[in-house]
Design a protein with these regions (language model features):
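N-terminal transmembrane-helix/juxtamembrane module of multi-pass inner/ER membrane proteins
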Residues: 2-10, 15-102
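Membrane-interfacial catalytic/cofactor-binding modules of polytopic membrane enzymes
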Residues: 139-214
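Membrane-interfacial alpha-helical segments at the cytosolic side of multi-pass membrane proteins
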Residues: 105-112, 201-223, 251-260
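Interfacial helix-loop-helix junctions of multi-pass membrane proteins
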Residues: 141-151, 191-196, 230-256
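Interfacial segments of alpha-helical transmembrane regions
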Residues: 100, 104-140, 146-160
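Membrane-proximal cytoplasmic C-terminal regulatory module of class A 7TM GPCRs
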Residues: 259-279
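Short, conserved phosphate/pyrophosphate- and ester-handling motifs at nucleotide-, phospho-/glycolipid
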Residues: 100, 200, 245
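Aromatic-anchored segments of alpha-helical transmembrane domains
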Residues: 38-42, 130-138, 226-239
């Protein structure tokens, strides 16, 4: 008589096991993100072509008029209220030059390791937001406030003689931070007229979406609310962006969300049709 054979049901991965990233897949993700950012920087630099300067300043003059119509042309007032506090402006310069990358990259890593079920969606949303920003840089080159000349370029008397009169202080150059647009490296790679839309503000909104959707603590919700506001203040007080640049950043994020959801609904319909056809 043969001995009975114990039959065991095949093991079914739990939810956590099913979504856990495979070993070394993170290397591929690093390659995807770094490669995409390299393409982004290359295309953004190509947008800084010959003849763009006059176009960028013309657009800046138009934007100032638009902000005047909307009663939001207050960037100079805000900067003048804080520019005397050198330590504070230097802190804002460091904030502007670092957290834009550090927090965004940190949240990507956190999503990959702790909220992997939503990582791909959020990664694609960030990539689409960044790609839409490139379209804005090509279509609407814009001189930021720190480069904007006042008085319609009519020389006016000042303590150092007749000058064109600058509305804004280039805080990265005058006060300092971790880097400056006048450094050799920045001059070689930076497109100073890639201001509309503000990707600083757009990425900050992306971070807020991640924290609101996937954060499980009240502190993360509070951070999600205040981080975009603090970023808006930083880009304005350092004279790197206009208020309408931030509005443009919000537009590309909302557009990316809409496109992403449209793509998801289309995919859901296609999967449903395949299930019905196979039934």
């Amino acid at each position: 008589m043969t001995s009975p054979v114990d039959l065991e049901a095949p093991s079914v991965p739990t939810d956590g096991e099913a979504i856990r990233p495979k070993k070394y897949r993170w290397l591929r993700e690093i390659g995807v993100v770094v490669g995409f950012y390299y393409v982004y920087e290359t295309v953004r630099s190509l947008a800084d072509h010959a003849g763009i300067t006059n176009h960028a300043y013309s657009n800046a003059r138009r934007l100032v008029v638009w902000e005047g119509w909307l009663h939001i042309f207050h960037e100079q007032v805000i900067q003048q209220a804080f520019v005397g506090a050198t330590w504070f402006i230097r802190m804002m310069n460091i904030y502007y030059g670092t957290l834009h990358f550090v927090i965004t990259a940190g949240l990507l890593v956190w999503m990959y390791r702790k909220r992997h079920e939503g990582y791909k969606e959020m990664r694609n949303l960030l990539g689409l937001t960044t790609a839409l920003a490139l379209i804005g840089y090509w279509l609407f080159p814009l001189a930021p406030p720190r480069l904007y000349k006042c008085n319609n370029n009519i020389p006016v008397p000042g303590p150092d003689g007749f000058t064109l009169g600058k509305c804004f202080v280039d805080t990265l150059d005058k006060v300092g931070g971790l880097w400056s647009y006048h450094s050799p490296i920045a001059k070689a790679v930076a497109n100073q007229y890639a201001a509309m839309p503000s990707l600083h503000f757009g990425w900050a909104l992306w971070c807020a979406i991640v924290l609101f959707r996937f954060g499980r603590h009240r502190a993360t919700r509070v951070a999600a609310f205040f981080y975009p506001l603090l970023t808006l203040f930083a880009i304005v007080v350092t004279a790197n962006h206009w208020f309408l640049d931030a509005a443009g950043g919000a537009v590309i994020v909302l557009s990316a969300v809409w496109i992403t959801r449209l793509h998801q609904r289309r995919g859901d319909r296609q999967r449903l049709q395949r299930v019905r056809s196979s039934a």
